């Protein structure tokens, strides 16, 4: 077996040596170059067989290469320009490896030069791609190694450094995801319950509130009506009148009481139209007597349905709500430091009773406050008529007495009663309103 292998190796080496010996280097003398130029001028560059027959040991291929490579002065020698490289690549894409046809397209270059240049370009391209692959793999490897080594470094860091690094990462995420991060923050931050919609009378009133208010909207706080705002006065008077008339009609349950209540309401509305104070009132107040009857029925049904729930004790009574059920001569201010007599706050008490009537529609909208203070949080409110006792008798009043009492209580006139004595206990306003 070993002998056969040795023999095969010897035969291969002998064949290679024979091929090397057969390889003949073609040399051209000056006489042969002169003969080649003369034959080309006679026969041109198309009849290489006739030209090669004039030589003893030259083939057609050797003659053609000698002419195009060394003797022809029209062909370029030296480096290739980028334009020639682009033209060569496009021609090779069209003609393939037909170098003679490609040489006709690339002017000034022989077929052999075109072939050699294309192989050189292919080698450069392959080398460049190999280098880019190696560089990409190296960068990926470095990133992978860095990703593995970073936790080891973070273990040795102090907690302060870790917090700084985490905050830095959060900043980067906020910069990259600016819109989404801001949207998420806006969704998470919840506005307090005290921020209420300002729905007074439209755009004009909103602009007036924005100009006269001292509250800065940039702080995220809501804007509310002041205690002495004319809108509050108008709404309170309307609410008190409607409630008192409905209770009176409900108590009498006669057509005469309905007509009297309707007359009082018409007089009040006519005065309200003439007075600028009531321009903030209810916009659709011009209703008919049938609608007034429906309103009374609604108030009657609502009062009967909610009477039991209003009598239930409230576990979270606020100091402001406890003032409604008290009959003392002194009203406690919310600040807890000052007391005032009742006669000085008659109009304030009217507004508080009206606010109590409006609470079931929007409990957070209008709450009694002191001075120029504005609402900052929702307050627990005692339900309507919770403090009324069933045993209080309902006195009977004539028409003149009833109108006098209405004027005294400030329903037709916003000024307090001048004859009120601050040293005496106040009249039972709730009983009077209930009876009216």
Curated annotation (Swiss-Prot):
Tissue: Expressed in all shoot organs with higher levels in leaves, stems, flowers, siliques and floral buds. Also detected in roots tips.
Cellular compartments annotated: Nucleus
GO molecular function: DNA-binding transcription factor activity; sequence-specific DNA binding; transcription cis-regulatory region binding
HTH myb-type domain residues: 20-71, 72-126
Compositional bias (Basic residues): 1-11
Induction / repression: Strongly induced by auxin in a IAA14/SLR1 and ARF7 dependent manner, especially in xylem pole pericycle cells, lateral roots initiating cells.
Disruption phenotype: Abnormal stomatal clusters formation composed by two to four adjacent stomata and some unpaired guard cells originating of extra symmetric divisions in cells with an abnormally persistent guard mother cell (GMC) identity. Abnormal stomatal cluster formation is complemented by FAMA. Increased accumulation of CDKB1-1 in single flp-1 and double flp-1 myb88 mutants. Induction of ectopic precursor cell division and delayed stomatal differentiation. End wall thickenings in all first generation GMCs.
SMART domains cross-referenced by the UniProt entry: SANT
GO biological process, one term: response to auxin
Keywords: Auxin signaling pathway, Cell cycle, Developmental protein, DNA-binding, Nucleus, Repeat, Repressor, Stress response, Transcription, Transcription regulation
Self-association state and partner proteins as the record states: Interacts with RBR1.
Entry protein name: Transcription factor MYB124
Organism annotation: Arabidopsis thaliana (Mouse-ear cress)
Gene name, Swiss-Prot/TrEMBL: MYB124
